[in-house]
Amino acid sequence: IRAPGGTGTSSHTMTGTSVHLPGRITNQRQLALMMATGREITGKVPAARWDVEAAVASSTDLGEAVCNRMKYGAFIESAELFDCRFFGVSPAESTAMDPQQRLCLEHGYQALHASGLTKADLNGKEHGVYLGFSCQDFAKCLENHPAARGVYSATGSSQSIASGRLSFVLGLQGPCALIDTACSAGLTATGFAANALTLGECALAVVLAVNIMLVTDVHRAFALAGMTSVAGKCFTWDSRANGYCRSDSCGACVLQVAGDVGEEQLIALLGTSVRCDGKSASLTAPNGMAQKRLIQSALAVAGAAG
């Protein structure tokens, strides 16, 4: 399944995945079914995250549209649950860990397990970990509640530790990096992992992306900027589009050099390319022509350019 004439990442394959999304979606089949049926997974911000009514009440001077944009999102239920002892983490340290770190441990391991690998198979191997990670809400929670800070707070809220913790727990000694390019962080992490495989820096890489919303700050800022939907719904490529809806998520996949695996593969990775918009209408606005060139570059790497 290698693309004819491909010169880049065409010898890489995906061998295992793990996912946890709103709507109690915990596997690829459930995700595909949700997409096929159009089931909605967005809704009002749950009280377990923050007091949305209080946040809206303190923002009424900003107008009805901004207040409505602040009310909605898509949230993972029971994101705080974690089997700490399975990963050799004490209850005290687990309590001080960003839920995003816990989810990365769970789904990084589950993706490797889905690839047929055990803890014994992984320890001491030069496998890579590449994590797309942008949200820093847990650190903000600690800032807002000084009494909750303790000996594990620094590592529990650190971005760099989020990727390093999986390598530490599983004994992985390959490249380990956290990539923050906002909403493209997961795709950028995939591109970096593919390049590492191509360069021989590792023969296997775990790619993860995670986002868990815990405080209202970013919600409010995006509502003010008009980025988020008034009705809490995404209408992509649709005349009804009026913004997007922020969401929790965690996903992981395992990429390997194709020659190192047998027939069990989910996807062949034919080509990747990573670029930046450069100058556009504003700092956060997309650049259509730059995105077109990015797609053309990835197709060329895959040997599939027309």
What are these regions (language model features)?
Residues I1-G306:
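Condensing-enzyme catalytic core of the thiolase-fold
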